Amino acid sequence: MPAFPYADDLAEELASMAGEVPATVSVLGLAAPEQSAVQRRLEELVLAVAGPRDGASLETVTHQDRTTVWLPGRLRAVGFHASGSMTVHLDMPPSEDLFENDPGDAELTGMLRAAGDQIGLPSLVPAEDELLFERLWRVKAAGERRTEPSLCRALGSFRHYVRDLPVYGRASSTVELGASGGVTSLSVSTRRFAGDGGGARVAEPEVRTPAQAAREVAARVAESFAGMEDTRLTPQWFRFGYLSLGRRRPQTLLTPFYIASIRVQSETEVSAHVTAVPGCAGRFSPTLNLVPKPRRVA
């Protein structure tokens, strides 16, 4: 491991954050998204979000890497051919459908769960998988006068679980709501869809220990920050699960990874550094560079 202050401490702290991990884990094959299936799912999602159309017809345009669907004057949606990911955005000004007051976490979370169920999010993934609510955010804005920011939107994220393991990467799904409970935007970024034919077990390798993975993370971080020894590194979390690549990138396997988030503090900036290392040894351990090397500030 390259010499770097805190490297050994960093590895120990990360390893202690991992919690229990299984002794072995399934490497799963993924079905290549078919363009026709991406379009069908996208159009079905648009209709579920839009509700009654008053006779308006969908307009669909297929590009090399994506399919775009419009409901004129209502919404725009995009489906990505490489991954099957989808986004839907309603044509609603941000100043409309605002909350008069904040109803609290429990009510907002309930609204988001209900909206997800109503548009059929759980049915998008295979029956043996789960799409579980993960986190609530509030989108707020303040007026010209010095007043408490108003709650504009409630935003919830959902996490896809495959064989009881979370699939990390971007949020598996997000739902944004206005005060009426209507969806204002939506995203779905799961790698497995109901009926897509994927999910076959390719292998069942042994899982690396958290200590082994943490040492690799520390070594990578030490290499990335070589020459910047005054930088302070603080581990935020260290998790085990599957990893989904970006929505514009194809992916043939779900393989296990350890993923670390590290707070980076220097004299000039504070940022977060995310590193993923393989969760198993052998041919199912691709190397990923999720974050570019840090920029040195003179």
Task: List where the protein language model places each region.
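Intrinsically disordered, low-complexity, compositionally biased regions/tails
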Residues: P33, L245, R283-P286
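Segments that shape or occlude catalytic/ligand-binding pockets
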Residues: H89-A276, V297-A298
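Preferential activation on post-signal-peptide N-terminal prodomains/segments
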Residues: M1-A141, T147-E148, C152-R153, H160-V162, ...
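Mixed-charge, low-complexity segments
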Residues: V274-A298
